[in-house]
């Protein structure tokens, strides 16, 4: 059974995010922009996530809700992603999600486009 936690090993720190921004590839989809870096090693904790949410998205309440929805979508679907992947996700101002299902679909759609999903699904 996959671990559904979102501990320190699942998060990107600022130096790791800088590395993803400089060395990773960029993808756009469903109101999201993602920088993706495929690391050589596959650590036991799998994929890692970093979020970059700008003020253009709205008030703090809206920005924090978007971050919560994206973290939850990543947390529950991390086992579907290829291990050894670092993601930095930046929601664009046009994204209008009604709730978790929309955020989940946007994240999985982006991962599908970037070929980050494990094939055995």
Name these PLM-found stretches.
Residues 1-121:
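Positively charged, solvent-exposed patches that mediate nucleic-acid binding
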């Amino acid at each position: 059974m996959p671990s559904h936690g979102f501990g320190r090993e699942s998060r990107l720190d600022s130096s790791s995010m800088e590395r993803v921004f400089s060395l990773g590839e960029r993808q756009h989809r469903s109101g999201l922009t993602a920088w993706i870096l495929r690391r050589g090693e596959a650590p036991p904790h799998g994929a890692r996530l970093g979020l970059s949410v700008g003020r253009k998205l709205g008030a703090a309440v809206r920005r924090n809700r978007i971050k919560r929805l994206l973290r939850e979508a990543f947390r529950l679907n991390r086992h579907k992603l290829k291990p050894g992947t670092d993601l930095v996700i930046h929601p664009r101002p046009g994204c209008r999600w009604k709730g978790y299902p929309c955020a989940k679909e946007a994240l999985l759609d982006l991962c599908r486009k970037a070929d980050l999903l494990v094939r055995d699904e």
